[in-house]
Amino acid sequence: MLAPTDTKERLVIIGNGMAPGRMLEHLFDKEDAGFDVTIFNAEPRVNYNRLMLSPVLSGEKTYADIITHDDAWYSQHGVTLHKGAKVTDIDRDAKTVTSDTGITAPYDRLVIATGSNPFIIPLPGHDLRGVMVYRDLDDVDQMIAESAKPNAKAVVIGGGLLGLEAAAGLKMQGMDVTVLHLMPTLMERQLDEASGHLLEQALIDRDIKIMTQASTDHIAGDSKVEKVVLKDGT
């Protein structure tokens, strides 16, 4: 049996990615978890598998397909989930956290599991509308919306694993895709030169344009991105 509510420690978790999801699974494997759990999720949704974002981008899966813990799961385990609530203040003396939606929750134990932020190359024009990152479902939804526009084109800066997954997904959505990569071969940290060339050819066969040894100078456009200019003037 679960311990009475008044004897449970108040556990507050900031972030609702894969790590806190697995932590809760292990916690609830015990017969007596002993915690009253509250989660603040900056995203307006339940827990999902971020590793499966690429199939969502390509159209092979939907958000519903990659949910790991649905609303019923949180309810079943007595977890309070605040969706779309970004924590903006932690009061360590009062042992409370407060969100941008005005919710304040007390805690006995606090877990901060917000994950990482995507790196945006600090190039001139990086803040133009239409310059996107690839980290969460909102980013994927934005890219899919752009791909639906007539004659949509995409430039992916970076020929690592994530960049190539994004390029492949955008191509499957019907976009004209070009990958710009600084090094001589793709995925040079994981593949040797011969394998990198084989991968490049496989992507070219999918009608994805590849430009290696491409050093980006700036992103051009008035209010919205229009093109990417390389240091050699291309």
Which residues does each PLM region occupy?
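FAD-binding core/adjacent interface of flavoenzyme oxidoreductases
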Residues: 1-12, 68-157, 213, 228-234
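Beta1-alpha1 glycine-rich phosphate/pyrophosphate-binding loop at the start
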Residues: 2-80, 167-194
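A general structural signal for well-ordered alpha-helical segments in protein cores
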Residues: 20, 50, 67, 120, ...
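A Rossmann-like FAD-binding core segment of flavoenzymes
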Residues: 36, 75, 81-98, 105, ...
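Active-site/binding-pocket entry motifs
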Residues: 45-46, 117-120, 224
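Rossmann-like NAD(P)H-binding beta-loop-alpha module
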Residues: 142-191, 225
